[in-house]
Amino acid sequence: PTTRGFARYYGLADGCCNFFNPGVEARDGEGLPGRKGQNRLRRWAIEDKVIMGYTNPDKDFYTTDAFTDYAMERLVEYKDEDKPFLLYLPYTAPHYPLHAWPEDIAKYRGKYKIGWDEIRKQRFARMNKMGIIGPNHKLSERASKAWEDLSEKQKDEEDLKMAVYAAMIDRVDQNLGRLFAKVKELKKWENTLILFLTDNGACPEQPNTTPNIPPGPVESYRTVSVGWANASNTPYRRFKSTDYEGGTRTPFIAHWPGVIKPGMTDQVGHIIDI
């Protein structure tokens, strides 16, 4: 990134990684970090140095937290700049693998046992009520087996997957709160344009390389199921890696106090517009 216009950089220089330990070496008292494949080394970059297989010695390391810590340090470092500056903070959450802190997972355990069919119906109704979608919108066909066709054991396993997924998003929310608090502390809130978006729809890919380890801890490498990816993309069809709206249409939030008026738009846009 530092050869492509960024003055500073810290973080992943690849598509995804283990959230607790992006490297290949186990820390004391932990098992080997779950990986997508034994021959898959993830590139990590600190400023202009690229590291293949980065293991942070701190057992409290978690990428979403670490990215935010670095971002907040840069806000302080550049607070007296005369020119506007860009802070690009690309969290990998909630991309697989499913990794989250136990206390965050506990908030959501059991909340998804109603299943993806009911979740899709509830979200569709709420989106209609909020005016996010119009009255002519229809809920897409289910892209997986019916929730009721699963055994009780399978339902519990699926509930855990989605609880971890939700916990990952919860942690993003917590960290954005920390970041915004820092912007306000530096008295930059009124002069800061915030753009928040995701790169694609939810993912149906299944590189579950640790099928015998439940999702959540450093040793695991698990993903959500197709049914949950389908529910996450309500009301659209299909998922990431397809040309359907479930893969290509994503939310976008722009915030600038006193400049951007509250409201919604369905105007077509693309990342290149930014």
Predicted regions and their residues:
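Structural recognition of the beta-strand scaffold that forms the well-ordered cores
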Residues: P1, R8-G11, F85-P90, L193-L197, ...
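Extracellular/periplasmic catalytic domains that process cell-envelope and extracellular macromolecules
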Residues: P1-G5, K79-K83, K187-E190, W228, ...
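Formylglycine-dependent
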Residues: P1-I105, R109, I114, A143-A166
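Acidic active-site catalytic centers that drive phospho-/nucleotidyl reactions
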Residues: A7, D173, N191, D199, ...
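Phosphate/oxyanion-binding loops and surfaces in catalytic or ligand/nucleic-acid-binding neighborhoods
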Residues: Y9-L12, C16, M130-I133, N200-P204, ...
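Substrate-binding rim/cap in mid-to-C-terminal beta-strand-loop elements of soluble/periplasmic
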Residues: C17-N21, I46-G53, G177-A181, P211, ...
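A long, amphipathic alpha-helix that forms part
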Residues: Y62-K79, G110-G134, Q154-T192, A202-P204, ...
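Short coil/turn segments at secondary-structure boundaries
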Residues: H137-R142
